[in-house]
A protein has these predicted regions:
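Hydrophobic alpha-helix-in-membranes signature
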Residues: 76-77, 123
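Conserved Class I SAM-dependent methyltransferase catalytic core
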Residues: 99-156
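SAM/dcSAM-binding transferase cores
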Residues: 153-194
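Short, structurally constrained coil/turn elements
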Residues: 50, 136-139, 171
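Conserved SAM/SAH cofactor-binding pocket of Class I
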Residues: 1-68, 72-75, 81-86
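Mobile active-site "lid"/loop adjacent to the S-adenosyl-L-methionine
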Residues: 77-104
Length: 194
């Protein structure tokens, strides 16, 4: 059975390619505002063995029209909402929350997510609580979160959040990318395989 996926702000398409490889039933629509990034994603998709299941749309997700409801939605939105901005607007759109606010991202996901679908987002750790609260206000509830550290000694710097429409007790996991010796941890390697 085909599952419909949506990658909001796909960039060069890496996450879409990974999902297509992992799920042989997934048909993925990837939406990217930036023309250059969308073109690179188009080329990456065309060169992949999953090209028949990957669609790229050079569009703003706020004006993206679809009749589909999506079984899964993923997004890795811009990270540097409050940091110094570049004079280069392309870099700003790639690195800053300039073209799609986190509130708008939740609203879009809520509107087109299937009733039993899931929405996954990768965020800077300092945005995790805000995003979780905003998603809850809009009817998407945290099911699972994976909090990421560089090493055990570091603070969390990323959160991988999974939402759905059902209220449940969220599951929280923590992962360190590297161990004390600077090697990738087995947990991180296993997570990359998943």
């Amino acid at each position: 059975q085909t599952t419909n996926g949506l990658d909001i702000g796909t960039g060069t398409g890496l996450l879409s390619l990974m999902l297509a490889q992992k799920d042989p039933d997934a048909v993925i629509d990837a939406v990217e505002l930036g023309t250059d990034a969308a073109q690179q994603a188009r080329e990456n998709f065309a060169a992949s063995p999953w090209k028949e299941r990957l669609n790229i749309f050079n569009a703003d997700i706020l004006s993206f029209k679809t009749e589909k409801s999506y079984d899964f939605i993923i997004s890795n939105p811009p990270f540097f909402e409050d940091d110094l901005r570049s004079p280069d607007e392309t870099k700003n759109n790639a690195k800053h929350d300039t073209s799609l606010s986190l509130n708008e991202l939740v609203r879009v996901a809520q509107q087109i997510l299937a009733a039993d679908g899931s929405f996954a987002v990768l965020l800077p750790y300092q945005r995790v609580n805000y995003f979780t609260e905003e998603a809850g206000r809009q009817g998407l509830h945290l099911a699972q979160q994976v909090l990421v550290k560089q090493t055990e000694k570091h603070n969390y710097f990323r959160g991988i959040l999974f939402f759905n429409r059902k209220k449940t007790q969220p599951v929280t996991a923590s992962i360190n990318i590297k161990d004390k010796e600077g090697n990738y941890t087995p947990e991180f390697v296993a997570a990359l395989k998943d």
